[in-house]
């Protein structure tokens, strides 16, 4: 249908970042609220220049037909999301565009009566779509940065089927850019925002936590119970160490790169002890502890029973490392990175990183070391 409409075969444009599903130039939803599934497709064509175009297709007489097309804001689609905030039941389309110069723009589209309208247009670094205010409808939070003004947060809430700007907030001036924005489910059932930002030094990341104060009806910075200076407490020195839901419980944990004091000895430069922290919890804040390989980009959770009682050293083989007893005499675990076809006596697979696999072998018996548990604690960073 799109080829017939354009008179040529277009180049489909895949988003470069996933918002939860597989990457696809097609997205489906009931855009106009008529109860039937519509489609949107992103493409570029020689006749219409370098910018991405978005076309809306409806089902007509058993076939797809293009009903509207609109030029996008840049040459690349970074992300695609949808939001159902209209009383009519229609769904709005959120598209993050990126230009070759690095500028990014978020467009919100509304489709009614076979007309695609751009109802919101904002520059952004990161955005998050979630019911932050507890209204029952998705809110839109946009982080942007401009030279001389630092990072700004804008909160848009859903009113009368539109996103309405309700707050602007200047963020910690020590951050120079936003590298990640995540919604995190708290113990109280409400959502917090976890922000990862580049620090002023340019060589480290740090984090901030934002929450919605229902009494003030505003987003503000959350004061962690156990940390008076969350910015400095969460500084880490690898771009791989971004916040994520490390244990799959809906809460996003912040990785804390920690020294070896009281935890054991670590003598391999590419490795680091990491504690994944939920600073919004009143009780158990450390959700996972283990070792991150910052060269190959993976994390391996270690059993709590080994914490403070081990040393981590280079292994006997290239790209391998070992977990030993604190005195170095007892070998508990060997971890190595190998080619896919390499096997070894006693080794089992932890996971894959690109075209390589990570294996482990348990040495002397330790009650807390079990293959299934170790494989379950393997995470690609």
Regions from the language model: what does each represent?
Residues 361-362:
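A bilobed periplasmic-binding-protein/Venus flytrap-type ligand-binding module shared by bacterial periplasmic
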């Amino acid at each position: 249908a799109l080829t017939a409409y354009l008179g040529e075969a277009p180049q489909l444009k895949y988003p470069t970042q996933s918002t939860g599903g597989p990457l696809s130039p097609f997205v489906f939803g009931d855009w106009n609220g008529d109860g039937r599934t519509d489609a949107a497709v992103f493409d570029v064509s020689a006749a219409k220049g370098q910018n991405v175009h978005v076309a809306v297709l409806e089902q007509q007489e058993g076939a797809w037909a293009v009903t509207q097309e609109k030029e996008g804001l840049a040459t690349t689609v970074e992300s695609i999301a949808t939001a159902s905030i209209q009383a009519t039941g229609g769904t709005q389309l959120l598209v993050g565009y990126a230009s070759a110069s690095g500028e990014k723009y978020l467009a919100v589209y509304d489709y009614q009566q076979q007309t695609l309208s751009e109802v919101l247009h904002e520059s952004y670094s990161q955005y998050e779509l979630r019911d932050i205010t507890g209204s029952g409808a998705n809110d839109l939070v946009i982080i942007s940065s401009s030279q001389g003004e630092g990072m700004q947060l804008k909160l848009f809430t859903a009113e009368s089927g539109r996103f309405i700007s309700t707050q602007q907030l200047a963020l910690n001036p020590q951050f120079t850019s936003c590298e990640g924005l995540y919604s995190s489910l708290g113990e109280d059932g409400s959502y917090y925002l976890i922000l990862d930002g580049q620090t002023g030094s340019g060589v480290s990341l740090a984090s901030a936590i934002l929450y919605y104060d229902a009494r003030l009806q505003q987003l503000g910075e959350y004061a962690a119970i156990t940390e008076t200076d969350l910015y400095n407490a969460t500084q880490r020195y690898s771009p791989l160490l971004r916040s994520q839901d490390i244990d799959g419980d809906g809460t996003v944990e912040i990785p804390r790169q920690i020294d070896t004091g009281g935890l054991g000895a670590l003598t391999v430069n590419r490795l680091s002890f990491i504690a994944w922290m939920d600073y919004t919890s009143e009780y158990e804040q450390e959700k996972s502890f283990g070792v991150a390989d910052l060269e190959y980009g993976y994390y391996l959770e270690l059993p709590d029973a080994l914490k403070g009682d081990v040393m981590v050293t280079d292994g006997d083989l290239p790209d391998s490392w070992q977990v030993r007893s604190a005195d170095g005499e007892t070998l508990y675990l060997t971890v190595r990175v190998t080619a896919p076809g390499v096997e070894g006596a006693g080794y089992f697979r932890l996971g894959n990183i690109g075209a390589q696999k990570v294996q482990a072998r348990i040495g002397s018996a330790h009650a807390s070391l079990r293959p299934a548990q170790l494989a379950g604690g393997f995470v690609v960073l």
